[in-house]
Amino acid sequence: MCIRDSLLASKVTSTKELKNSVKVKYEHKGKEIDVEFDKLIVAVGRKPNSEKVLPKNLGIKIENGFIQVNEYCQTSVENIWAVGDVVRGPMLAHKGSEEGIMVAERIANKQAEVNYDLVPNVIYSHPEIAWVGKNENELKSSGIKYKVGKFPFAASGRALAVDQSVGFVKVISDEKTDSILGVHVFGPAAAEIVQQALISMEFGSSAEDIALTMFSHPTVSEAFHEAALSVNNQAIHIGNKK
């Protein structure tokens, strides 16, 4: 999938199949727009079917198809556990794998947990989109004051060299403590950059910690470094806010 135009707060109202294309009518910002596309992909989401596969006499609580579990993936029946897409949270393979490891450890009477605040999300489009932690809307809703640093791949030497200069890295940190609250990447190697951010956040790094870390040159990872520098108006290869 190649992203050319991304529209939010939009609604498809009708589609019509033509001879060699598909006509799509949608609403955006109060306007009705008609566009023709070569192909139309419809993503309708997924939902669990736990109610159909679990015997009712087990006594396991289910809500909206999801098996109800505690923070350690234990169901309402003491010796039955559930992980992955059938329980709450994002339907991601790595999230389910970590839950499986946690459950195995706890069954063996060992301490283990999953940090659900730091689950990496990746959209494998072209360019890639990836994020971890909070976004600005979530922080505003929670009343948390924050700072933002942003760096475009158009200013990255490596991104320009490989002709993948579309996109940016955004770092959000706490206004007082400077702790990184969220990292969002749109562009080349987004999934890999977010993984670096996740490790940093797992160990409580601040934007300044990343800013003081040496990054290899030329790499697309430097965009993460520059975005962290930008949080405190110290970016090197772009202008800073006054």
Label each residue range with its predicted role.
Residues L8-S21:
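A conserved short coil-to-beta-strand element within the FAD-binding core of flavoproteins
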Residues E27-K29, N70-E71, D174-E175:
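Short, acidic, Ser/Thr-enriched surface-loop or helix-capping motifs
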Residues D34-I107, E192:
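FAD-site-proximal beta/loop scaffold in flavoenzymes
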Residues H94-D117, K145, F203-S205:
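Internal hydrophobic alpha-helix adjacent to the cofactor/substrate pocket in enzyme cavities
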Residues L18, K52, L58-I60, A161-G167:
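Short loop/turn motifs at secondary-structure junctions and domain boundaries
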Residues M1-I3:
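Short, small-residue-biased leader/transition segments that mark boundaries at the very start
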